[in-house]
């Protein structure tokens, strides 16, 4: 099978050269169809059965599932096909041209995380996938950088239940078994405009929001006091006020005010519980000013995630790498994969390069990543 696929670096180059930006702004958002076509062709060449799945609610985006083998269990290797937008003024290289310099591979998606598929393909090029004793699945998802729509849709619709999954996000090959979730909400206050010379004739939305923020700060303190997970560097749920806007003139009573905030819950905290806590915190303001305060989601929420520390996947990967699993504060698609099977986040490159100008992956990751993929496939699909 050695001659079926292009060389590793050419696969990498083709992936980086195929734009697949995800953005909430429609003018920047791109389909990942061309990238999915590339991947589907290569995995078909290796003998995989390939299914391309349109993702509802997206702008022409797709998941790809490549599968081989029969029966229950097996291994799922997964990652997302999209990247964030890039700031052209801050890049010193063409983001869509793979450039090797000073033991680094530069390009948009080299670390986060289109390059991971080049590693999978390269590791499998010498494997006769028809001889695996358990199934091997490769999932390429859409829209991770915005809504995680691809992972959500796959987890809600698939009947697959592998023994375990590995998501190849850039972790510097440090296995991650837990991370926090993310909830982003908008708090809106509707006041009543009027001339500032007669405050009694209006309802100042900024003043109501000031009251609401006081209660939100009390909730922040309560979350910090009540919930604790010492493995995290920030061992409690965080609550951040990120953006506020209200009013239009100094001599006008403010008619509306809007606050954007986020909460990063610990694993095990349910989204319903957090929504209830936020609504309870704001209840005094709502009762005092009926109909003037609302809370809504800015983005679909992401729950916290945790793989059981005593699971076989953790034991095997820790032994292969000679290192213990860790936890992180950022989010991945792991909560959705975890609904199917125990999941670890583990991949080449550094998270510090994600979403940065002149993104790169150090070439020192190439050999150990290829070896790791070969070893986990051998362990979970041949034993």
Curated annotation (Swiss-Prot):
Task: State its cofactor.
Answer: Zn(2+); Co(2+); glutathione
Cofactor note (record) = Binds 2 Zn(2+) or Co(2+) ions per subunit.
| One Gene Ontology CC term in the entry | cytoplasm
Q: Which compartments is it annotated to reside in? A: Cytoplasm
Q: Which GO terms describe its molecular function?
A: acetylornithine deacetylase activity; zinc ion binding
Do you know which Pfam families this protein is assigned to?
Answer: M20_dimer, Peptidase_M20
Tell me the pathway: Amino-acid biosynthesis; L-arginine biosynthesis; L-ornithine from N(2)-acetyl-L-ornithine (linear): step 1/1
Q: Where is the active site?
A: 82, 144
Instruction: Indicate the principal place this protein occupies in or around the cell.
Output: cytoplasm
Q: What is its EC number?
A: 3.5.1.16
Q: Which residues bind Zn(2+) 1?
A: 80, 112, 169
Q: Which top-level group of life is the source organism from?
A: Bacteria
Top enzyme class, one word, equals hydrolase
Q: Which reaction does it catalyse?
A: N(2)-acetyl-L-ornithine + H2O = L-ornithine + acetate
Q: Name one GO biological process term.
A: L-arginine biosynthetic process
Residues annotated as binding Zn(2+) 2 are 112, 145, 355
Subunit composition? Homodimer.
The similarity annotation says:
Belongs to the peptidase M20A family. ArgE subfamily.
Function (record text): Catalyzes the hydrolysis of the amide bond of N(2)-acetylated L-amino acids. Cleaves the acetyl group from N-acetyl-L-ornithine to form L-ornithine, an intermediate in L-arginine biosynthesis pathway, and a branchpoint in the synthesis of polyamines.
Name it.
Acetylornithine deacetylase
Q: Which organism is it from?
A: Salmonella paratyphi A (strain AKU_12601)
The gene from which this protein is expressed is argE
């Amino acid at each position: 099978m050695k001659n079926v696929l292009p060389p590793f670096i050419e696969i990498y180059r083709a992936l980086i050269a195929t734009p697949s930006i995800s953005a909430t702004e429609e003018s920047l958002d791109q389909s990942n169809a061309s990238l999915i076509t590339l991947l589907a062709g290569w995995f078909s060449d290796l003998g995989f059965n390939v299914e391309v799945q349109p993702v509802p609610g997206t702008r022409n985006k797709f998941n790809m599932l490549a599968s081989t083998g029969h029966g229950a269990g097996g291994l799922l290797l997964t990652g997302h096909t999209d990247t964030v937008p890039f700031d052209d003024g801050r890049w010193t290289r063409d983001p869509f041209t793979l450039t090797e310099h000073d033991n680094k591979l530069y390009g948009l998606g080299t670390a986060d995380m289109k390059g991971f598929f080049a590693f999978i393909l390269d590791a499998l090029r010498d494997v006769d996938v028809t001889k695996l004793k358990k199934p091997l699945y490769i999932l390429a998802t859409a829209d991770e950088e915005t809504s995680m729509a691809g992972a959500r849709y796959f987890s809600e619709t698939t009947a697959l239940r592998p023994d375990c999954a590995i998501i190849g996000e850039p972790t510097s090959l440090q296995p991650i078994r837990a991370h926090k979730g993310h909830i982003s909400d908008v708090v809106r206050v509707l006041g009543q405009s009027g001339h500032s010379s007669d405050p009694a004739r209006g309802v100042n939305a900024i003043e109501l929001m000031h009251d609401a923020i006081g209660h939100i700060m009390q909730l922040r303190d309560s979350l910090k006091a009540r919930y604790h997970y010492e493995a995290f560097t920030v061992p409690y749920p965080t609550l951040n006020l990120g953006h506020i806007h209200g009013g239009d003139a100094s001599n006008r009573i403010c008619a509306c005010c809007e606050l954007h905030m986020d909460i990063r819950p610990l694993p095990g905290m349910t989204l319903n519980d957090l929504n209830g806590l936020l609504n309870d915190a704001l209840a005094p303001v709502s009762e005092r000013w009926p109909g003037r305060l609302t809370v809504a989601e800015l983005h679909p929420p992401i729950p916290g995630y945790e793989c059981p520390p005593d699971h076989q996947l953790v034991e095997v990967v820790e032994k292969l790498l000679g290192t213990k699993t860790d936890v992180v504060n950022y989010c991945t698609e792991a909560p959705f994969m975890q609904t199917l099977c125990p999941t670890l986040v583990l991949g080449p490159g550094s998270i510090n390069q994600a979403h940065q100008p002149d993104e790169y992956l150090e070439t020192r990751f190439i050999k150990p990543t290829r070896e790791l993929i070969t070893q986990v496939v051998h362990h979970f699909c041949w034993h």
